[in-house]
Amino acid sequence: MVTVYSKNNCMQCKMVKKWLSEHEIAFNEINIDEQPEFVEKVIEMGFRAAPVITKDDFAFSGFRPSELAKLA
């Protein structure tokens, strides 16, 4: 399952979620503004900015369609 760590008012987060929905890729969203207990996990993965997208051991940050396509 794909997980998207997002933040409020994050344009790249919105773009990632829209892209995944348009390509019918199911995802679970964790909003780190609303669930701050996940901030440390994102930092431990080596990321400092949202969105962070993960699936199994694959993770990346930002709106990157070429990487999003690998999640299908």
UniProtKB/Swiss-Prot annotation:
Q: Which domain of life is it from?
A: Bacteria
User: Which cysteines link up through disulfide bonds?
Assistant: C10-C13
Residue ranges of every copy of the Glutaredoxin domain listed in the record: 1-72
Q: List GO molecular-function terms, semicolon-separated.
A: electron transfer activity
Keywords (alphabetical) are: Disulfide bond, Electron transport, Redox-active center, Transport
Gene Ontology terms: biological process:
cell redox homeostasis
Under InterPro entries, the record lists: GlrX_NrdH, Glutaredoxin, Grx-like_ET, Thioredoxin-like_sf
* Pfam families for the chain: Glutaredoxin
- Family of the protein in this entry: Belongs to the glutaredoxin family.
What functional role does this protein have? Electron transport system for the ribonucleotide reductase system NrdEF.
Q: NCBIfam families recorded for this chain?
A: GlrX_NrdH (TIGR02194)
Q: What is this protein called?
A: Glutaredoxin-like protein NrdH
List the source organism.
Lactococcus lactis subsp. cremoris (strain MG1363)
